[in-house]
Amino acid sequence: MRKNIRYYAVLSVVTALVSLSGCGGTDNGAESGTQSPAAEETSDGAGDAAGSEASGTEADEADTSEKTEIEAIVYELPTEPQKENVYVEPIENLREDFIRGVDISSILAEEESGVVYYNENGEEQDIFEILAQNGVNYIRVRVWNDPYDENGNSYGGGGNDTAKAAEIGRRAAKYGMKLCVDYHYSDFWADPAKQMCPKAWEGMEIEAKSEALRQFTEESLTQIIDAGANVGMVQIGNEINNGIAGETDWTKRRQLLQAGSAAVREVSANTGQDIQIAVHFTDVSDQKGILAIAEKVKEK
């Protein structure tokens, strides 16, 4: 059965419509409501002029709203594989242990919404199997501490908690792929611009926060491995150039990194899995900046 995908685009945004919805800086609705009575109290000529102006404004707004209706453009899905001029040059003589990884953290949310994947023959197939058959040997998955609001609603982005990471890790292992677990130590995305402390850790002193981070890492990682994942690497933080878990002071940041690393080593020893520890910084082309960060990490 042929499926259609609908793409919607807003053609324009009109200030009048925004104001009518209560988002404007002034009460335009009140002004519009007082124009007509004021016009009736004036002389006929002035009233007609004011009434005409008000009517003209209403007409303009009505016309404008018609022009900004959202139109749907329908694209039909192809019924057979399509040839594309996409070619990636192979890299010769790679070692067997060279990491060829893909981050598919949002895959469960995609599948729940009806997304399916097809192989090069146009056949529907498990995306994990497709990746493994095409040389991928590592799957990366992000983990947020508590990516839900007080009503249990996900913040979005795949809602990547430990349970979802465990399921992704299990499916990756089914096809012989290792898992890289990317701990953000936040309830949502952490990056150079924001390293928000998880809700449960707010107000903690660094000693308590370090212990909370160690315990969370140990329990989460154990749960992922118990689900059947073959964990080969763990990231202690995500893009932590400017902070981690709400901390920007380097002494405190090192303490958190040490706590996370200790937890990984403990789980590695308890499960028998050989797990590498990674720290994740951005702007690696800035050699001077990265070397400065490395010195900070090494300080006692």
Name each region found by the language model.
Residues 1-9:
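Bacterial N-terminal signal peptides that target proteins for export
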Residues 10-14:
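Hydrophobic helical h-region of N-terminal Sec-dependent signal peptides
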Residues 16-17, 48:
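Residue-level signal for mature regions of secreted extracellular proteins and peptides
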Residues 17, 96, 133, 226-228, ...:
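Alpha-helix termination/capping residues and helix-transition junctions
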Residues 19-22:
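C-terminal motif of bacterial Sec signal peptides marking the signal peptidase cleavage site
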Residues 27-79:
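N-terminal, intrinsically disordered, polar/charged segments of Gram-positive cell-envelope systems
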Residues 69-167, 171-173, 178, 184-212:
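N-terminal substrate-binding region of glycoside hydrolase catalytic domains
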Residues 154-155, 159-166, 190-300:
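Active-site cleft segment of glycoside hydrolase catalytic domains centered on the general acid/base Glu
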